[in-house]
Amino acid sequence: MLRLVVASPGAFSPRGLHDRRVVITDSADSPLAYGSRIGDGYSIIVPEVASFHFRPGSQDVAVQAEPLVAPERVLDAYYGAALPMAVQVVLERQPLHASAVVVPGIGAVAFAGVTHSGKTTLAYGLSRRGFPMWADDILAIDAFGVEGVSTIRLPYRLNLRAPSAAYFEGRPETGVARGEQDPGEWATAPLVAFCVLERRDRRPRAGSSVVRLPPTEGLMALLAQAFWFEPQTSAERRQMMRDYLEVVARVPGFRVSVGPSLDALPALLDEVEAKVAACLRPAA
């Protein structure tokens, strides 16, 4: 597990831009966060908000906030930028840009995709059908866990956008209460399926919105949504590739086409449920 701690004043000196590499960008490809490393120390810098510092072998992620920055902005920077990088460096697990739910008694289903693709909306919609939320926006994957490919439940704050929140407000939940205790942060669950979301400007004309991905396409789709620290060594790059190759070799993947209208969400959730359930059902 990881824990966020406040760095003592002056513990870390600022680094010049020439020593930094972009690690996270926004939808317009503008830099949001930078990475830097000195010896065995790693830093994530979110300009005008905070810098975060961590190293292998320590559970602490030390934060040094800029003056007068609201705590909420610092926490947003931690969850969105520092946490995924610390997962890779400290925990040696792969952070994926994904939300996830749990199929009780079976395992986690991930929904990966770019910002605004509908990850949180789909996961939250399924949570209202009786599949508890497991992750929002960042999912930690352990490709070589004791029980195969597994996930780690990271700390998160639900980031349901205003149109989706308005859509769900007042609509009844349809899931049956399952009476399971919340496993809490840092719990683990097998990864039993992953879905890569593809945003469409218009509703698909015909055919399925949920299509099984062959492993090669699944690998490329997951790598497109993977977080990784920069600068990255060749050994770290090889390990990341080994991990994702293991994921696509053992876990079924799907491409999910998401249209622009929330009115189509119930039908899409029905199809996701049916396709994933059919894949998880034991062969006769």
For every predicted segment, state its role:
Residues 99, 103-114, 128-284:
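Glycine-rich, often acidic-flanked micro-motifs
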Residues 75-95:
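N-terminal pre-Walker A segment at the start of P-loop NTPase domains
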Residues 119:
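Conserved lysine of the Walker
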Residues 38-39, 95-97:
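A short, compositionally biased
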Residues 1-70, 75, 270-284:
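Long, basic/Gly/Ser/Thr-rich N-terminal segments
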Residues 122-123:
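Post-Walker A alpha-helix
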